[in-house]
Each structure stands twice: as C-alpha cells, then as structure tokens.
C-alpha cells in the first residue's frame, strides 16, 4: 500500500478496494462485465472526524490506516489518483472492520 497525498476531510475515509475475483472456485474465468463490485478494501487515509453538535471537539473514527473494511455496495465516490483507483467513503458507509 503506497502512501498517497490525499487527506480526507471530516468523517471521510480513503479506501483502496481489493481486487475482484477473476475465476470461480471451479476454475471458470469471470469476464469484467460479470464481476461483482468489491465491497472490501484497505484504509489508506482517514479524516480527523466530524465535529460534535456543539462544535467543540471532533468525534474520532472507528477505523485507522491499514485496516481492512467491508463497506456499503453503493457507498462512496470512486476516484483515480496516480494511476490507482480509490474510493472516498463516509464513515457511515463502513459496515465492519475485518480482524486479522
């Protein structure tokens, strides 16, 4: 995982999606048009968190750089930076952190 010069704002998270499966368990090759959009990725950068209702302190996020997360299928915004594809997600789009 390369370091990127993108710093998410507030409760946003920068994720690099894991590669989609290219073959089935029985060895059949899956064409690009039939591949499922991956819902798992690695957190590359994390914003500082959003402000609380009083605007006095930041609410920290539940994820950190390097975490593997499962996120909502249609959540986030896809971007390309430095030849790599990333996803900028809101903290609400993250469904779970995968234990290593």
From Swiss-Prot:
The keyword Cytoplasm applies. Pfam families: Cpn10. GO terms for molecular function: ATP binding; metal ion binding; protein folding chaperone; protein-folding chaperone binding; unfolded protein binding. One of its GO terms (biological process) is chaperone cofactor-dependent protein refolding. Signal peptide: none annotated. It is found in: Cytoplasm. InterPro entries: Chaperonin_GroES, Chaperonin_GroES_sf, Chaprnonin_Cpn10_CS, GroES-like_sf. The keyword Cytoplasm applies. GO terms for cellular component: cytoplasm. Keywords: Chaperone, Cytoplasm. Heptamer of 7 subunits arranged in a ring. Interacts with the chaperonin GroEL. Together with the chaperonin GroEL, plays an essential role in assisting protein folding. The GroEL-GroES system forms a nano-cage that allows encapsulation of the non-native substrate proteins and provides a physical environment optimized to promote and accelerate protein folding. GroES binds to the apical surface of the GroEL ring, thereby capping the opening of the GroEL channel. Belongs to the GroES chaperonin family. This is Co-chaperonin GroES. It comes from Mycobacterium marinum (strain ATCC BAA-535 / M).
């Amino acid at each position: 995982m390369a370091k990127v010069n993108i710093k998410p704002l507030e409760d946003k998270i920068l994720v690099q999606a894991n590669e989609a499966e290219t073959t089935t368990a029985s060895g059949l090759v899956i064409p690009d048009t039939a591949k499922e959009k991956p819902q798992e990725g690695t957190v590359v950068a994390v914003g500082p968190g959003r402000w609380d209702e009083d605007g006095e302190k930041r609410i920290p996020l539940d994820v950190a750089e390097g975490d593997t997360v499962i996120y909502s299928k249609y959540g986030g915004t896809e971007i390309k930076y430095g030849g790599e594809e990333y996803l900028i997600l809101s903290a609400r789009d993250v469904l779970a952190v995968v234990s290593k």
